[in-house]
């Protein structure tokens, strides 16, 4: 078994990757990137014809996910997500003291959408669901 979760990889990088790393400016590599990502936000705004304040950029997927939890899940009701899914949903729920309920997948590891048809504080419907690799059609979502 090869573990590929959490950006781990048992294989060395491709030769081109090592060459690219060597060509980087080591002075810039010692600093954190711009936390506002202003250049990226400006380029995205221009490309998509949006105002800069309509674009949110995080410093990684876990950061973006944390901001989503803080923004969208602010009810006393529990949020719902599958019992077999990305391992950080319950972590953020615990950190931010958001009640949650894990909904069991069916015998084919699919989300049972009817389990989510009741009062809740929000739903996380991962699609595709990373651990299972199953992607549902838009009509299911």
Regions found by a protein language model. Give the residues of each.
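Conserved core of the PLP fold type I
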Residues: 29-141
């Amino acid at each position: 078994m090869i573990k590929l979760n959490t950006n781990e990889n048992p294989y060395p990088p491709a030769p081109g990757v090592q060459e690219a790393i060597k060509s980087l400016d080591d002075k810039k590599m010692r600093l954190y990137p711009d936390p506002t990502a202003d250049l990226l936000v400006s380029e995205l705004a221009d490309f998509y014809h949006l105002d800069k304040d309509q674009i949110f950029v995080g410093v990684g997927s876990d950061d973006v996910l944390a901001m989503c939890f803080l923004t969208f899940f602010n009810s006393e009701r529990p949020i719902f997500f599958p019992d077999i899914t990305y391992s950080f949903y319950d972590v953020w729920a615990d950190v931010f003291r958001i009640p949650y309920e894990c909904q069991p997948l069916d015998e084919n590891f699919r989300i049972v959408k009817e389990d989510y048809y009741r009062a809740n504080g929000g739903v996380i419907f991962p699609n595709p669901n990373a651990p299972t690799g199953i992607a549902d059609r838009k009509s299911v979502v």
